[in-house]
Amino acid sequence: MPTTTDAASPARPRTGRTAVRAHASVRVERGPQGAPRLAELRSDVPIVLRMTGVSPVRTGARAGAGARADPGPLPTMTVHLVNGAAGPLAGDDLRLDISVGGGVRLVLRSVAATVALPGRGPGPSRLTVTAEVADGGELDLGPEPTVVADGADHQISTDVRLAATARLRLREEILLGRFGEPGGSILSTLRVDVAGGAEGPGADLAGGPFGWVPLLRQELLLGPQVPGLRGPAQLGGARAVGSLLVVAPAWAGAGPDAAVAEGVARLPLTGPGYLVSALADDAVTLRRRLTALADPTG
């Protein structure tokens, strides 16, 4: 039976005056009739998860390990993240675990931006996201921007493990400061591994016969403590920073061509994917620039 914890359940005991710990999770699998099945949906305030849509089973959508070609449109489940409280605040330690089975697609969105705020808790606020995607599965993770308010110190750590034929679309957007204020500090770390390498037959979420192959390691540090942050070699006058990572077996051979436009660049990776990075003055322009180079066949 699916495990669902009501989003209104109280937060876990606080570790200080303002610090709170929360651990939420979502797990989607392929059901007996091919439709996506919500195996687990556990909210933990302030991380509140709500299922908001399920697509019908599409004839011809392929599932299971070993399906190395593009599986086409997959049965899709959509889940939205709702912030159940203000923040995160200093000292908060939040975690979200994501698991996607073979032959299904999970679209994970948020209903609003996350605003990292200063507080009285010990150390920075932290958000840790872990994700695993099985062969033939797909994760589309695209929350609304993280706004780093003046005086905030926030850390985001994202770890993704992909089976050999899994697909991923991961978007991250950061805004330094609310309207009319300077931004705080943020450290964002992204690690993505592919099981057994893109060409390793039989690779699975245990790492496959060839173990885990790093696809991307990216660390981004922004804030007033960074020397030259507003210089032409870094942000210049931009206050919005974003990236879009696309991973699919179709890019295991020759990746897409590199491309550059105003405020945005697309770079192929040594592996089955490519990375789009962009700068902008505001969130709307940032999203538009990321989208412009997101599809190399368009």
Swiss-Prot record:
Subcellular location(s) per record: Cytoplasm
GO molecular function: nickel cation binding
Entries under InterPro entries matching the protein: UreD
GO cellular component: cytoplasm
Superkingdom classification of source: Bacteria
Keywords, comma-separated and alphabetical: Chaperone, Cytoplasm, Nickel insertion
Function: Required for maturation of urease via the functional incorporation of the urease nickel metallocenter.
Subunit organization: UreD, UreF and UreG form a complex that acts as a GTP-hydrolysis-dependent molecular chaperone, activating the urease apoprotein by helping to assemble the nickel containing metallocenter of UreC. The UreE protein probably delivers the nickel.
UniProt-recorded name of the protein: Urease accessory protein UreD
Organism of provenance: Frankia alni (strain DSM 45986 / CECT 9034 / ACN14a)
Gene: ureD
